[in-house]
């Protein structure tokens, strides 16, 4: 299949069989293969690409307060992630997002946001950056919403990361065992906690 300019495998056919799905209103010929893939992840490990997700970085002294206003859920502490809906003032759903909080800003200081220090509210923590992940096909929709809501004083900077940032998702009971073979970093339960972000 393809979505938002990226081609992605929807399912994998057995060796020796043609990977063509017979589309029906019932279960297609892909059903058994998708079931086997799902069971493999549940019992062992699976990996899939998440590059096609929309990705945005927010920074500046007003970033936390801005995100706290447009997101319905709690903004996590540094090094943590949280799932949160984004709603309009009437409570209608704009998008279902994941927000991650980084510590001090990692990018070079530039533009009006970098010249502002401190913050007008107690909800500001100097130097924080935030990364939001959401539906890839809604990237432009999210961009328009963010732009409409951004303060005009330059206290918040929003950057669309697009395809510059690739992503992989690994899941299943053997996920940590695979990661241990790929890195010297501590990927134990204590070293890499659930919903951690570094």
What do the PLM-derived regions correspond to, one by one?
Residues 1-111, 115-198:
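Glycine/proline-enriched, intrinsically flexible loops and inter-domain linkers
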């Amino acid at each position: 299949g393809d979505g938002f300019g990226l081609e992605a495998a929807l399912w994998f056919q057995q060796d020796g069989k043609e990977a063509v799905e017979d589309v029906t209103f019932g279960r297609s010929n892909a059903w058994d293969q998708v079931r086997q893939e799902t069971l493999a992840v549940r019992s062992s490990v699976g990996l899939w690409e998440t590059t096609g997700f929309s990705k945005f970085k927010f920074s500046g002294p007003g970033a936390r307060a801005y995100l706290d206003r447009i997101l319905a859920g709690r903004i996590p502490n540094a090094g943590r992630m949280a799932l949160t809906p984004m709603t309009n003032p009437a409570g209608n759903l704009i998008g279902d997002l994941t927000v991650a909080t980084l510590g001090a800003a990692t990018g070079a200081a530039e533009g009006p946001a970098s010249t502002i220090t401190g913050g007008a509210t107690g909800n500001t923590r100097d130097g924080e950056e935030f990364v939001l992940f959401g539906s890839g096909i809604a990237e432009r929709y999210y961009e328009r919403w963010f732009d409409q809501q951004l303060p005009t004083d330059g206290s918040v900077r929003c950057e669309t990361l697009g395809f510059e940032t690739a992503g992989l998702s690994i899941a299943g009971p053997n996920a940590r065992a695979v990661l241990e073979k790929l890195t010297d970093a501590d990927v134990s339960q204590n070293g890499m906690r659930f919903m951690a972000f570094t």
